[in-house]
């Protein structure tokens, strides 16, 4: 039996940008309105089913507070993916993505997939960072980019599918057209629900 490929994904970004909420939405399809800061590092894993293989995603949720920054390089060091999150309603959190990206580059060079994520699109009326600014930052650093809403569930599964398609050893041709393009195709309706329902393909069992 072929062994299950495992990939480490580390979530980085300032405090309260929604790193934990993105992971919780992906893992359990829930959103906790009560904010609790991550203390140190949390770890969860989930199995993801692609068309031609199954992978185990190991999700490392890091604290955004400055007092925990000394811990983070050691977790970046052996990661396959770095997901750098900012809050679209907080310009400072966007500006600070530069230092998070540089931390990743310093530890991993170019041997890592980096995804820049603008979270909290459900608060579009309070937006301080435009989509164009996010796209420009991603282009500048030659990394991937998307926007999400952990609260509304917008683009969460699409985010992980996009990351999965870029993992080392994954043939991007095995991802369907919809899996490749769903990030730009889905949208938020007036009711705050995704206009396009994303497909499943994830193990929801606690044993995954």
From Swiss-Prot:
Amino-acid positions noted as binding GTP in the UniProt annotation, renumbered to this chain: 14-21, 38, 62-66, 120-123
Biological process per Gene Ontology, one example term: retrograde transport, endosome to Golgi
Transmembrane regions listed in the UniProt entry: none
MF term (GO), any: GTPase activity
Lipidation positions, renumbered (S-geranylgeranyl cysteine): 208
Entry GO CC: cytosol; endomembrane system; Golgi apparatus; lipid droplet; pathogen-containing vacuole
Protein origin, superkingdom: Eukaryota
Task of the protein: Protein transport. Probably involved in vesicular traffic.
Record keywords: GTP-binding, Lipoprotein, Nucleotide-binding, Prenylation, Protein transport, Transport
Family note: Belongs to the small GTPase superfamily. Rab family.
Protein name: Ras-related protein Rab-6
InterPro entries per record: P-loop_NTPase, Rab, Small_GTP-bd, Small_GTPase
């Amino acid at each position: 039996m072929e062994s299950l490929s495992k990939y480490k994904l580390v979530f980085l970004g300032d405090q309260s940008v929604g790193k934990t909420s993105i992971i919780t939405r992906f893992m359990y399809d829930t959103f906790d309105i009560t904010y609790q800061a991550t203390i140190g590092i949390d770890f969860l894993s989930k199995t993801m089913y692609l068309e031609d293989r199954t992978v185990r995603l190991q999700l490392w949720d890091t604290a955004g507070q400055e007092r925990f920054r000394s811990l983070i390089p050691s977790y970046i060091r052996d990661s396959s993916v770095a997901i750098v999150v900012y809050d679209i309603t907080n310009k400072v959190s966007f500006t600070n993505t530069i230092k998070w990206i540089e931390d990743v580059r310093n530890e991993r060079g170019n041997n890592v997939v980096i995804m820049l994520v603008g979270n909290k699109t459900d608060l579009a009326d309070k937006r301080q960072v435009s989509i164009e600014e996010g796209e420009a930052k991603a282009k500048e650093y030659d990394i991937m980019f998307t926007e999400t809403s952990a609260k509304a569930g917008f683009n969460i599964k699409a985010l992980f599918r996009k990351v999965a398609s870029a993992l080392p050893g994954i043939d991007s041709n095995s991802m369907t057209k919809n899996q490749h393009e769903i990030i730009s195709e889905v949208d938020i309706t007036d009711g705050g629900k995704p206009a396009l329902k994303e497909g499943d393909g994830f193990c929801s069992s606690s044993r995954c």
